[in-house]
Amino acid sequence: MKKLLMAMLALVMMAGCSSETAKPAQVEKPQPKPAEFVTGRAAFQKLFIAARGWARDAQPYRLESMITDDSKGKEGKSAVWRASFGSPLQRGVKAYTWSGEVSSDRGINPGTEDTYSPSNTSTQIFDVAFLKVDSDQALETAQKHGGEKLLAKEPDTPVLYILDWSRPTNELIWHVIYGNNRDDYKLRVAVNASSGDFIRVEK
C-alpha cells in the first residue's frame, strides 16, 4: 500500500512538472525603431541609388525636406526627404521619398513617372558634383542672416530645405525656409550649395 501511494505521488509530481514545462514561453514584441532624422545629402545618397535603378542617366532637379508632426527641420535634418529626378533618355521624371518616421512608409518609396521636358525650368536637372554643402551647413549660414534671431523669438517655427538649380545665375542653391512652405514663410535665405556662401535673403 505504501509503495502504491509513493508511486501515485511520483506520478502527480511528474504531471505537475510537465504542465509547467508545457506553458508556452512569452515572446516579447519587437519594439519599433525610433524615428530617424538625417541631413539632405545623407537622404539624397539613398534616393539617388534608387533613381539610378529606374534610369541609368537619372539626374536630380530638386531635393526637399518635408515638415511633419515629428520633424520640424531643426539642426538641418528631417525625417522625410523627397528627391525628384529627370531622365533625358527615358524622357521622364520621377520622385522618390525617403522616410525615417515610425510608420509603414519607412524607407524609400517611388512616386509616379511623368513626362520630362528639357526646356521646363522647373525641372532643370543638375550634376550631383555641385552638391558639396549639406543642409546642416546651409542652416548654419542662414542662422547668421536672420534665422537665429527669428528662432529666438519664435522657437516653434519649422525650417524647410529646398535644393534646386538656378538657371539665371547658373548655380546650385539651398533655400533655407523658416515657415511652412516656399510661399508661406517668415524668412527665406539662399545659400550656395557648392561653397556654402550666403547669396541673399529671398523675397
Which residues make up each language-model segment?
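Long, terminal "pre-/pro-" and other extracytoplasmic accessory regions
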Residues: L5, C17-K203
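Sec-dependent bacterial lipoprotein signal peptides
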Residues: M1-A15
